[in-house]
């Protein structure tokens, strides 16, 4: 055995160096930490320690560490692996024969002492049970005797009292004799009762003793079984295990575990011995799962030896589920709804002839076929089911009542629409409009002698096509205003088309009839060409001659409107939840989103929950066209409502609903659908669009951030600006909205290099700071003409100039000379204009261009000159061209740039 140092020996036997040095010193062997220790010194130290502490039995300690992997089922059908490490430690003791005999003798003495103690305990218990039974029997007999004596005394007293009252003094002797006889009889009965009680007590005592003996015998048998198993356990522990390899040690440990736990009444299943890991898996996954199940199974209960019992019974038939399928669904979502793996769904689709991936979106019909093929019940769900349910859950009265007509005034710009309505309302509205033209839809209701009429005043400018179309859709009657001195104009024709598209009757108001050059007959002729036939010509359109300035014919116009409404028999339900249409909307800085709503049916009350396109909210306030607060609005009444979550789009349907939560869900659903449709329309990634972009070349863009006061103006301006786009310059609206110009708008304009345009709105303080810091182009407008003209000018500045060739001189070749430096030199006479050097030229022969190049040399009498005027001779050298002949014409021109503009 090789020598080791004290330090190494301390590490080997797992003790401190200082303690080992001290033990060597106590044994008479002085050592330091770095000194070496021989085998003789080790034996001497061991002998010293045995003398000091006594020699213990030989022991063998085995430490075992096993690792395993456990798969745990997680959420979503996924499983994760958990590493488990089990550490065990067993100590085996080898004792000498003398020690074993001594321990066996001690154990035998211990068992005998326990047996003696058990017998003494049984005898003591038996004696105690007998004494207890005797005491209970005596107490019971005593109590019964006392109770009997009391009863006898009471009976005696009663009888004596009765006898005293009935018998006379002569019968006293007989009574005393009867009493003595009765007393003797009672004493005999008492003795008989006492004897019976003693017999009962003795019987119970014997029964208790027999029961105690039986219990003691049973306990003795159980203890004997335990003692025998305990002795076997100890005898096994004292056996000698000669372990030579780690495999044998593990086998011995497992055998010992089974014997020990079998003696305790708990039979653990046999553990599957794990082999060391190698590159090839030595056992299958099923074997590993079975082994782990055997190790884990039944922690809390008693189990039989090594039986592997499956705890879950597979159902006899598949579970059929109700699968709810929307309009579109992914394969993974369908598998999740059916509680199956995605691979099974893909297999089922492949059997049906459809290839799909797990994240592929499939339509409703395909999903229905797959689900039914796999045995499930399918419930088809429409995406707008919630929207339809909310819309249908409304209280409406059944009684329809006559309502006021909704009249839209349409016509060409500056034909007097607003002035006509202004006279009817006896107000001055036109002066408030910028430039004297209407740029919003104005909604008013007026009370006449014959009833109420609601008027919608639409713009006549060409930019407000969408706004006029909305007015025609929401109306009952269209009043077409045509100036008598101007006749039918483009917007007049457009108004006729809108009225025909909406199938709305038309009443023609021939305005400005008081002007000297008014010609109503010309108006009738022009309108008849577009399908508007007067009644006097056999048509169905009423013509009324009016003057908005003088008030002529206004009453006749109102009568014609009311007559037309009576023919239409306009009715609406007045009671119940209201519905209507958004005429106009805008963002007020102090009040938030404001929407002008025309109620079609029902009654709109303050506090109602309304659903309006993508927006929803509770009506916080309602105002009429005179800016007066109102609490309710019936059919055909226009009102401004406050309280929506955002600015709705003009033309959106307004519906009163019951539940604000459902209204929010429907609004969010509509926003999502709109976003999907918007994304679907973006075709930049499509092949045909890619080729179109390749062929376009470089296209300049004018970026604009547009803010206006109302939604209709935003639509009109955006549409007009986008129509200005050409193949070379395009208008791009990078941002638009309703309300003032904010810091966000300014930041967007700075990032996209855009022009900030405000139509009837202004920038706030924070936006102005950003505009000044970034030097942005901010422009305010109140008339749409000026806005469109300036954007046109900006676009024209981005157009590349047009190149034009202008002829500046013409020379005739009279002779041809040869020059060693320039080749053929043409001797020419300037017949027109001026010949300039280094200008492009054309050589013409018989008025046909045969060459186009550059004038390289220009001389007059051997002197180089820059230009030669008309009527002078000169020599011309054409660059890279020598085929000049007499009689040719040399044409000199220059290229000039002409700035283009957008019409």
From Swiss-Prot:
Predominant localisation class: cytoplasm
Gene Ontology cellular-component annotations: cytosol
Xref: PROSITE patterns: G_TR_2, IF2
Spans annotated as G3: 457-460
Domain tr-type G: 402-571
UniProt keyword terms in alphabetical order: Cytoplasm, GTP-binding, Initiation factor, Nucleotide-binding, Protein biosynthesis
Gene3D superfamilies: P-loop containing nucleotide triphosphate hydrolases (3.40.50.300), Putative DNA-binding domain, N-terminal subdomain of bacterial translation initiation factor IF2 (3.30.56.50), Translation factors (2.40.30.10), Translation initiation factor IF- 2, domain 3 (3.40.50.10050)
Keyword GTP-binding applies: yes
Skewed-composition ranges (Basic residues): 265-279
Region listing for G5, in residue ranges: 547-549
Molecular function GO terms recorded: GTP binding; GTPase activity; guanosine tetraphosphate binding; translation initiation factor activity
One Pfam assignment: IF2_assoc
Residues annotated for GTP binding in this entry: 411-418, 457-461, 511-514
Subcellular localization: Cytoplasm
CDD domains in the cross-refs: IF2_eIF5B (cd01887), IF2_mtIF2_II (cd03702), mtIF2_IVc (cd03692)
Region of interest (G2), ranges: 436-440
InterPro entries reported for this sequence: DNA-bd_dom_put_sf, EF-G-like_DII, EFTu-like_2, IF2_assoc_dom_bac, IF2_II, IF2_N, P-loop_NTPase, Small_GTP-bd
NCBIfam families per the UniProt record, alphabetical: IF-2, small_GTP
Sequence similarity: Belongs to the TRAFAC class translation factor GTPase superfamily. Classic translation factor GTPase family. IF-2 subfamily.
Described function: One of the essential components for the initiation of protein synthesis. Protects formylmethionyl-tRNA from spontaneous hydrolysis and promotes its binding to the 30S ribosomal subunits. Also involved in the hydrolysis of GTP during the formation of the 70S ribosomal complex.
HAMAP family listed in its UniProt record: IF_2_B
Protein name in UniProt: Translation initiation factor IF-2
Organism of origin: Cronobacter sakazakii (strain ATCC BAA-894)
Gene: infB
